[in-house]
Curated annotation (Swiss-Prot):
Pfam family, any one: Tub
Mutation effect (K250A): Abolishes localization to the periciliary membrane compartment in AWB sensory neurons
GO CC aspect terms: axon; cilium; cytoplasm; dendrite; non-motile cilium; periciliary membrane compartment
Effect recorded for R252A: Abolishes localization to the periciliary membrane compartment in AWB sensory neurons
Protein known as: Tubby protein homolog 1
Domain of life the protein comes from: Eukaryota
Subunit text: Interacts with rgb-3.
Biological-process GO terms, alphabetical: chemotaxis; lipid metabolic process; positive regulation of neurogenesis; protein localization to cilium; protein localization to non-motile cilium; receptor localization to non-motile cilium
Effect of disrupting the coding gene: Twofold increase in fat content. Extension in life span. Defective in chemotaxis. Reduces AWA cilia complexity and branching from the AWA periciliary membrane compartments (PCMC). AWB cilia are severely truncated due to elongation failure during postembryonic stages and AWC membraneous ciliary fans are significantly decreased. Increase in localization of PtdIns(4,5)P2 and PPK-1 to the cilia base in AWB neurons. Reduces lengths of ASH and ASI neuronal cilia. Mislocalization of GPCR proteins to the (PCMC) in AWB sensory neurons, such as srbc-64, tax-4 and arl-13.
Main location: cytoplasm
InterPro entries: Tubby-like_C, Tubby_C, Tubby_C_CS
Amino acid sequence: MTDTNSQWIEMNLQRQRKMLEDKQKQKRHQSAGSVRTTSTAMSMNSMKDYPTFDNSLPFSISDNSSVSVSMNTPLIPTQDPIAQPRMQSMPRQQPQQVQESLISIGDYPDNDINAKLSKVNLTSCVVSDDEDEDKRSYADSPWNTDVVADRIPSEVLPDYNFIKNNLAKFVEDPAVEHCLYKCSITRQKSGVDKGMFPTYFLHLEEFDTDKRQKIFLLAARKRKKSTTANYLLSTDPTNLSREGEGYCAKVRSNALGTQFTVYDSGQNPKKTTNHAAIRQELAAVIYETNVLGFKGPRKMTIVMPGIEPPTENRPAVRCPVRPIQDKHTLLERYRLNDLDSLKILSNKSPQWNDETQSYVLNFHGRVTQASVKNFQIIHQSSPEYIVMQFGRISDDEFTMDFRYPLSAVQAFGIAMTSFHGKLACE
């Protein structure tokens, strides 16, 4: 009787597998001819006006504007605040031959995934369904080899000499407008206790020289004797302490690891009477909790101070937020909808791909491995203008690209929140 039941169960399983394979095959045939392709020229032709972060509106564009700006989009100076880019020259290809630089960050079945990708010409996509993929292997860079993607085709290249000579000022000030900063983050776990408390190093990639050098910007490490996540950021990689001369910021979380605040090096308002010495809040990051246990991409909201526009006598500066009471903090102001002089950003929602059964984002060749840590930051009024993007390229290497209005400290602090485990978000 037991053998009969086993045979019946096995036959049932085989029949279900066959039905699932036929269904997937039919779905592939239906959608193979209409897979979205990423055409750089077409994307650039649709660009008109681009967002600015002045003190009045979130972005100075009309509601009907067509906006499409990627992290690899050139910005050409005109009379507009952010101008229409020049088209890149690309080899002529048929639409189905242009590969999408998509990174998968959601759930999927592992079986026959390579076959699924090849059916729709997405063989360079990588997929994942776990929080910690450190031990897994992934595909190579998904960027189409016919496109030159290792140079920043933006309007203005970073002033590398200024950055080297004025490191502390550069990391704290808002980024220069029309300039993209391509950075990398290295996670170092070596040492007795660095498996639990790794050190993170942020470097700016230098592209206007033949040597492709990297400029050290910041280092970060989680404090050992803290009950919640508490990361110290410093421009001195040899002294990651509050007493060090390079100490410039810290990132603090709540108990669940779902809400984070990025502070500058100022003092706690409870420990000083000097208002000018009180710490500023540079950003707050809120991860949406997942109380029902549904797995999927993380949802982030970033609250940050607004930017005072530049004048003849000074560049653009950040509006100071120095809360003395809890109700004046960025997190509380966001909860109470008190958003005057604040900017609200969020992560770009990935798109579900039926063929790979996963969520995907286009990182334009800067991210090569799947992870729920990967994200792109946008303003909802201009979802194609990527303010920041972060993602994995190897077990302990990540890329972090950012633009105005973020500073290096703000961007690095936001990246630190992605490294920290979130009990209620998985």
